[in-house]
Amino acid sequence: MSALKDIVELTAKELVDNKDKVRVTEIEGEKTVVIELRVDPAELGKVIGKQGRIARALRTILTAIGRKIGKRVVLEILE
């Protein structure tokens, strides 16, 4: 399991009540890493946050790590 996937999974599980429904998938390409986060639709707002602040913060952290490893990181939050 990669550090990117670990960070997203740990953060999401701390934000939601139904931790069993948190699924994180990592798709790695040559220059890009896509992290897909799936949570219970009823708790989607907890992961996104008010006006998308939590999602934006997560993306900022992933972007910083991505620069260090030389890849573009994309976070997709799915139902």
From Swiss-Prot:
Signal peptide: none
Subcellular location: Cytoplasm
InterPro entries in the cross-refs: KH_dom-like_a/b, KH_sf_prok-type, KhpA
Domain KH: 32-79
Keywords per UniProt: Cytoplasm, RNA-binding
UniProt-recorded Gene Ontology molecular function terms: RNA binding
Homology family: Belongs to the KhpA RNA-binding protein family.
Name of the protein in its database record: RNA-binding protein KhpA
Taxonomy of the source species: Bacteria, Pseudomonadati, Aquificota, Aquificia, Aquificales
